[in-house]
Design a protein with these regions (language model features):
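Membrane-embedded beta-strand positions of outer-membrane beta-barrel proteins
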Residues: 3, 15-17, 44, 58-60, ...
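Transmembrane beta-strands of outer-membrane beta-barrel pores
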Residues: 7, 19-23, 48, 62-68, ...
């Protein structure tokens, strides 16, 4: 369920609120059978034109949901030993988009720059049980942030090249004294470089070649190559900004 309001101003200003029942990231788990709306989102977007060739949009958002986790905590390395109960997950961030095309016509050349920063906080009661020693339970608060920046440039009609970098911080824990000696401090900040080249033979199809240098796993570097064919069939919605 979502409600939005666009202000009657010379600039584009949109305010919105949304309620939902999330599944998966960024929430450990949510109960689909629970009453009410367990997840809430607030967002604001502001944008406008810069001359006849450029435009921009900036945004801010905040999201909150209740935790309902029955298995291991996903943010801990040895998750089989840990269970999180109760508490909330909160996520907020800032985003920015800049677009350029000669006289506003993107058919020949265009540039799109995009960036986003976000932070996630999880709190609740954590239980450590390795099956050998007595179980220990105490409050925990986890904080982690991440960001990405990317650019896509259309240098001739139908052909584009792009570059992207995304990164997560190693995060931090704030726990009770009972759990302090049982949790190892996170010491790795995953990141990834991506570059791509694509060709669009029509408005509804695209062929993309992409390479990733992926360091999202500690002590392991992955060199990944993808070849994609993307095709759209039938009616499609309005173009996004």
């Amino acid at each position: 369920m979502q409600a939005t309001w666009i202000a009657p101003l010379p600039l584009f200003l949109e305010l919105g609120v949304e309620g939902d029942d999330p599944v998966g990231f960024p929430f450990p788990e949510s109960s689909a059978s629970s009453n009410g709306i367990p997840s809430y989102t607030l967002f604001a977007r502001l944008g406008g034109d810069i001359g006849t060739s450029s435009s921009y949009r900036v945004g801010a958002w905040w999201l909150s949901s209740e935790n309902d986790l029955s298995s291991g905590a996903p943010f801990l390395d040895f998750s089989d030993f840990y269970t999180l109960q109760g508490g909330d997950t909160r996520l907020w961030g800032l985003d920015f988009i800049f677009k350029w095309a000669p006289e506003g016509n993107p058919s020949e050349r265009s540039l799109k720059l995009q960036a986003e920063w976000m932070q996630r906080r999880i709190d609740g009661n954590l239980t450590f049980d390795d099956g050998v020693n007595p179980a220990v339970t105490g409050p925990i608060k986890v904080t982690q942030d991440g960001w990405y920046v990317q650019g896509v440039y259309q240098f001739i009609p139908q052909w584009r090249g792009g570059l992207r970098y995304d990164r997560l911080s190693n995060g931090s824990y704030d726990v009770s004294s009972d759990l302090a000696g049982l949790l190892a401090a996170p010491d790795y900040a995953p990141y990834r470089w991506s570059t791509m080249l694509d060709w669009s033979p029509s408005e509804f199809s695209r062929i993309r070649l992409q390479y990733n240098y992926d360091r999202t796993q500690q002590s392991l570097a992955n060199n990944e190559v993808f070849l994609q064919y993307i095709m759209s069939l039938g009616a499609h919605g309005a173009h996004k900004f």
